Every structure is written in C-alpha cells, then in structure tokens.
Amino acid sequence: MNKKIAIVTGASSGFGLLAAVKLARSFFVIATSRQPEKAEQLRELAAAHNVSDSIHITALDVTDEQSIVSFGKAVSAYAPIDLLVNNAGTAYGGFIEDVPMEHFRQQFETNVFGVIHVTKTVLPYIRKHGGAKIINVSSISGLTGFPALSPYVSSKHALEGFSESLRIELLPFGIETALIEPGSYKTSIWSTSLSNFMSVPADDSAYHQYYKKILSYVQKNGEESGDPQEVADLIYQLATKQHIKNLRYPIGKGIKLTLLFRSLFPWSAWESILKKKLFS
C-alpha cells in the first residue's frame, strides 16, 4: 500500500466524518464507528468525493474493552500507523448537584478512558514509524469551565492533561501529539448527545431558573456556530505538515480572543462577564 495509514475514531458523524473524507485524499483511512452498518452518511460523502477506495469502515466502541482488543488485532495488519485521530466523544450536561454519578463515569469512559485505551492499543504500531502523529480532538471546554456542562468540561480538561504528558513522552520517538480545541460548531454532539444526556433540573430545583437562561444562551450560540469543515481542514493541515510545532490549536469564532482575555485578566473579570451573561 503506497498511502500512509490513518485511524479516525468516531467517524460516522461530525468532525470525524468530515476529517476521514478529507484525510482520504492523502491517507488510507481506517474509519471507526460503533455501528459501521449505520455509517451511511460516511459512505455517501466518501463516494461523492471519490475516495471510497481509500476508506475502510470498521467497528470500534471506545468504551468496550473487548471491542478495543479486537480493533487492535485488526489494525496490526496495517502497521506501521502514521496518524491517529482520537475524535470519538459525547457530551453529558447538567448542574453538578443534579447530575448522577453514573453520568460522570460514562462521560469519562468515552472522552478520557476511551482515548487512553485506544492510544495505548495503537502506540506499538505508531512507534514503528518515526514522524507519526496523534491528534486528539478536545474542546474550548478543556480550557475554560461552563455551568451546566460540568461532566463534559471536566472530561475535556482531563484529556488536555493526558495529551500534554503524551506529547512529551513521545518526543524521543519522533512522534508529535496535538490538541484541537474547537469552539461552537454545528455537530451532532450538541443536538443528539445533550438532548439524550442532559440532567434537566426539576421545576422545584434550585437551579431551574438558571438552567432556562443557560439553555437559551447555548441555543443562541449554537445558531451562530461555525462550519465543522473548518475543523476537518485543520486536522488535515496538521496531519500533512512535516512537523506539528505546537501542542494546542484553538479554532472557532471568538475563541482566540476569549483565550487572550483569560490570559491577560484575573479570574474575577472573567467571572463577572459570565455572571452578567448567564445569570442577570
């Protein structure tokens, strides 16, 4: 096989779908989905871009140990692996007091432990090739907190720490790790995940009135969100560069300005802005 080999997890929708199709221009892509038989959108988009022959769709549930073990055995046939894009993720929401502990655990199983387990499984095949890359899809939520999204926010903060350590550990092997930190984009993680996994406060909950205001803000923000193709294009750009010089790559409307504000001003200033926007 002449093409380099890339793995993209969570490739049946959102960033993963678009990234898999874009990467197929230059890579042979192993695109994973929990239910490959339902990845019709990926098949159709790949056909539309004439890259169907460069994409292999396979089963992977990043929360299931046996699924990861089976995936690892299958991937060994493609070694060495040149690129791993850890994109699979979901979003649980709600106020901390209202969110069941099981939701926190499930959130971390997908967004943190799933990434760690897949990375550990694939690393032996990545280390065989100097110049390989690992791209972890994080979020602006991995850099700044937001109310009513604590399970998601805390999982992305954990992913940031894992990725930072991973990058340093793999430098001696010529393997570079990067974090992509999108802001608000039109993907199914918000429309599907939060509608299924949001712990909505009861009418008599102390948080009910605040939930309505925050939900209104999130919905308005969603209407102004960006095109997810921007994120897929950034993944492709980093994947095809000779070197990934930085660890973090924030992307999205107003994100860099937000991070600049956070770095220049004290927490109290940021808190005042959030309080005014969300609770006043």
Swiss-Prot record:
Annotated residues for binding of substrate: 139
Q: Which residues participate directly in catalysis?
A: 152 (proton acceptor)
Give me the residues that bind NADP(+), please: 3-29
Q: Provide this UniProt record's keywords sorted from A to Z.
A: Oxidoreductase
Under the heading CDD domains, the entry gives: 17beta-HSD-like_SDR_c
Identify which top EC class this enzyme belongs to. Answer: oxidoreductase
Extract one GO molecular function annotation from the record: oxidoreductase activity
Q: What is its EC number?
A: 1.-.-.-
Entry keyword Nucleus? no
Q: Does the keyword Oxidoreductase apply?
A: yes
**Pfam families in the record:** adh_short (PF00106)
NCBIfam families from the xrefs?
PRK06914.1
The UniProt similarity line reads: Belongs to the short-chain dehydrogenases/reductases (SDR) family.
Q: What is this protein called?
A: Uncharacterized oxidoreductase YusZ
Q: Which organism is it from?
A: Bacillus subtilis (strain 168)
The gene that this protein is the product of is yusZ
